[in-house]
């Protein structure tokens, strides 16, 4: 019985269903215990040749095979002759619902978990400047590549689909629902502005030459299944181009729902590049448990995960780390007075460089405390700290210490957030402020059990001391001041967070290409990114982090 149970719980039944539980759900929308005799017989018959006896593709063969199984049951006295004759007359009644990774809740999270568990050893070609950090994480974090690092008693690696594993994650179902709703609600509200801008200007890619725009489109074409299929068929470049300019029936994504339309494949690429994207992640800063994870608006249409895979300029969300360096390493305080004047730094080429401010800003020379500069996200105050530090590499190393793994170019401009960093890293690093100066690596799996319920792996987050507890407390106060009298004040004025311990930092990259908001509370740290697939496509006006990203955090927290 144990051998049969092991077999039925792992064997392939077709339609991407492994194990009897998945098969019962896929073909009949039932639990195994709810199957009747003829349904159970059909599934038993399928396993010998899932395609040949598929009740979907080959119903006549499946019916004959089912009846053969029931005949054997009668011969072995599990059913009577009368029952056999009666059951043979029953047609196959499917409630076919194939398992799809595109459906359900937390689609990006589920795919991320699968990818991490199956992650191969990183290569330099794959990760470039981030190679050493990614290799170190793969080697030190047991979750990464777990299926490749661990082996069953027969010496083969684990298979998360075939081996009946139960993987327990940290995700909160309620928080995940809130996060998905908050993000998609905001993206749907923003999309008409982007559509109107493109209609008004006739351009999707801003400040981009026609040649550069065409390269973006051609590159996107090469990543499509249509393009690969045409190449495989031996189509010429001209034939491929003609095919992509020929209208066909297709289904496209909109925030009002999927739409069936007649469109050229080329225009469909432009349509989907015009769709506003976003991502969200929330974690418990004390335990490191990831509670909500949304990598994009719709996994079916946009597979690229903008929580963990995607990296963008983090803009002003880096500034709390720069201020933290000033306090923890240089002995400054939030009350350190700094003149409101332009600051000139040197570039890596030893040329003078004076950071500009966003919008209209007056340099009046008046002394203001550092907390004033952070609350207003002033570039000259971050530049002033870099000038006092005199060592961009020391600042970059400090930021890595806070929990950022991605490469940070050790130059003065890092103070304005020119580094490309993932939202996953940013949320983890911001948790250091709330967790009394201790960095806790975000964790998303707590344990793995085999099919018998035995725990074969358990995981706890890696922790490291990053800054002093006093510095962490000071930084939390400064982040809270941003919400009281800074760029995050909308959380109080619009969302009513007046009696809540909440802090945050907005971020807006050059020309509104990326909008960020990082929010912190005692038991939850969350981050939001909003932008387009291509950085050359963006809102010309009104694309600030306070306008685009902050509302997602506000709605989620409500």
Residue ranges and their predicted role:
Residues 1-232, 385, 400-401, 405, ...:
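Non-catalytic, structured segments within soluble enzyme domains
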Residues 19, 38, 48, 64, ...:
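Short, solvent-exposed loop/turn segments at the edges of secondary structure
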Residues 27, 49-55, 160-164, 303-308, ...:
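Flexible glycine/proline-enriched surface loops and loop-helix/loop-strand junctions
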Residues 33, 97-115, 332-392, 439, ...:
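Conserved catalytic neighborhood of penicillin-recognizing serine enzymes
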Residues 107, 169, 173-189, 219-284, ...:
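A penicillin-recognizing enzyme superfamily signal
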Residues 12-17, 31-33, 37, 71-85, ...:
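Bacterial peptidoglycan biogenesis and beta-lactam-recognition machinery
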Residues 12, 16, 32-35, 39-42, ...:
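Secondary-structure capping and boundary motifs in well-ordered enzyme cores
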Residues 22, 67-71, 107, 111, ...:
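Residues on a specific face of well-ordered alpha-helices
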């Amino acid at each position: 019985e144990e051998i049969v149970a092991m077999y039925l719980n792992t064997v392939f039944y077709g339609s991407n269903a492994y194990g009897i539980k998945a098969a019962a759900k896929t073909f009949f929308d039932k639990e195994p215990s709810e199957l009747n005799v003829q349904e159970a017989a059909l599934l038993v018959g399928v396993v010998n040749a899932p395609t040949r006896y598929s009740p979907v593709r080959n119903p006549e063969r499946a019916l004959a095979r089912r009846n053969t199984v029931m005949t054997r049951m009668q011969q072995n006295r599990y059913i009577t002759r009368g029952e056999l004759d009666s059951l043979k007359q029953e047609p196959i009644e499917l409630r076919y619902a194939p398992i799809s990774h595109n459906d359900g809740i937390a689609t990006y999270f589920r795919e991320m978990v699968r990818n991490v568990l199956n992650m191969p050893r990183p290569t330099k070609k794959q990760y470039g400047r981030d190679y050493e950090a990614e290799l170190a994480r793969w080697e030190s974090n047991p979750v990464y590549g777990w299926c490749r690092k661990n082996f069953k008693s027969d010496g083969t690696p684990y298979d998360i689909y075939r081996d009946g594993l139960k993987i327990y994650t940290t995700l909160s179902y309620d928080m995940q629902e809130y996060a998905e709703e908050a993000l998609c609600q905001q993206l749907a509200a923003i999309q008409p502005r982007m559509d109107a801008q493109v209609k008004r200007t006739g351009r999707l890619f801003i400040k981009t030459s026609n040649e550069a725009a065409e390269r973006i489109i051609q590159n996107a074409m090469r990543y499509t299944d249509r393009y690969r299929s045409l190449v495989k068929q031996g189509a010429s470049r001209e034939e491929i181009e003609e095919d992509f300019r020929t209208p066909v029936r297709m289904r496209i994504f909109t925030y009002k729902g999927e739409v069936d339309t007649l469109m050229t494949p080329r225009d469909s690429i432009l349509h989907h590049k015009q769709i506003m994207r976003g991502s969200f992640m929330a974690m418990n800063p004390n335990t490191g448990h990831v509670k909500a994870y949304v990598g994009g608006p719709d996994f079916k249409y946009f597979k690229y995960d903008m929580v963990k895979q995607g990296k963008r300029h983090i803009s002003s969300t880096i500034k709390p780390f720069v201020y933290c360096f000033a306090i923890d390493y240089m002995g400054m305080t939030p009350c350190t007075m700094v003149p409101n004047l332009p600051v000139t730094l040197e570039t890596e080429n030893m040329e003078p460089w004076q950071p500009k401010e966003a919008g209209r800003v007056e340099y009046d020379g008046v002394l203001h405390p550092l907390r004033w500069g952070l609350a207003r996200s002033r570039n000259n105050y971050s530049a002033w700290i870099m000038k006092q530090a005199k060592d961009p590499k020391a600042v970059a190393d400090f930021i890595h210490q806070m929990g950022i793994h991605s490469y940070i170019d050790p130059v003065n401009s890092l103070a304005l957030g020119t580094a490309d960093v993932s939202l996953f890293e940013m949320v983890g690093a911001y948790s250091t402020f709330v967790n009394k100066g201790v960095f806790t690596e975000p964790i998303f799996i707590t344990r793995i059990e085999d099919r018998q319920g035995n725990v074969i792996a358990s995981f706890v987050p890696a922790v490291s001391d990053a800054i002093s507890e006093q510095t962490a407390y000071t930084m939390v106060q400064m982040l809270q001041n941003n919400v009281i009298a800074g760029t995050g004040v909308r959380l109080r004025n619009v969302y009513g967070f007046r009696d809540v311990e909440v802090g945050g930092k907005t971020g807006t990259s050059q020309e509104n290409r990326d909008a960020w908001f990082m929010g912190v509370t005692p038991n939850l740290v969350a981050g939001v990114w909003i932008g387009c697939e291509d950085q050359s496509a963006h809102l010309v006006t009104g694309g600030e982090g306070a306008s685009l990203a902050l509302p997602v955090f506000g709605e989620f927290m409500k």
